[in-house]
Amino acid sequence: MSTPPLTPPTMQEVHVWQWDLDACGGEFDRHREMLSMQEHERAGNFRFELHRRRYVTGRGKLRQILGRYLALPPQAVALEYGSEGKPFCTNQPVGWRICFNLSHSENTAALAVSGGFEVGIDVEQIRPIEESMPLQVFSSREREQFDALPPSEQQTVFFETWARKEAGLKALGTGFILPPEHFEFDLSDHGDTMPRFVGGAADEASHWRVRALSPGPACAGAVAARQTGWSVIQMN
C-alpha cells in the first residue's frame, strides 16, 4: 500500500515521530524486506528474538518515513555512517539536506527529522537509578542540585537530564565519546530549555536549544540542536 509523500521540515522545524516497536509486529516481514545487507547482518547478531524484532521494526519504520520525504521506496534510501557512527542519507535531491536521528528505549522509538541542521533525539525509560549513575552523568554542580532534590523527584529528574545530554551529544554526532558533563543543565528547569554550559562555555551554550518530549508513561525524552528559533512538530 502506497503512502503519501511528506513535505520536508523548514529551517524552523523539527519533525518528531514516535511509535511502539512492539505494536508493529504485523509489519515485521515487510520491514525486514526494506533493510540493507548491512542491516540484515546486524539484525542477525542479536542474541534475543525480541531485540532483533525491535531492531528490524525500527530500521524499517525509519526507511519508510525517510522514503516519504525523499519520494523513494524504503529500500532505496541510502544510509551511510559518519566517523562516530551517526547515520545520514546520501541520495537526497540536489539542494536538500534532511538530517535525522533515531532513538529507542525498550519498546519506545522516536525519530527527529530536521531541514538543514544536525539534530539529536533521545528517549529513556524511567527505571531504578544505580548508585554510580549520577557520578557518571552529572557535573559537580548538577550533582549538588540532584542530591538536594526530594528522593521522590530524583528518578524523573535524572532521566530527563540524561535524555537532554544524550540528545545534545547525538546532535554533535559523538554520542558518549564525549563525557556526559560536556552538556551541563540547571536541574530546576523543566520542559524546553538550553544548557547552562557546553564544553564548559556559557557562550557556546547560548547557541543550543533543547525541547522536551513526552514519549509515554514512565519515559523521558528530549530533542537538541545547535540552532535557535526552531520548534517541534509532532507527526503522529
Role assignments for model-derived ranges:
Residues 1-236:
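Core catalytic alpha/beta fold that binds nucleotide/phospho-ligands
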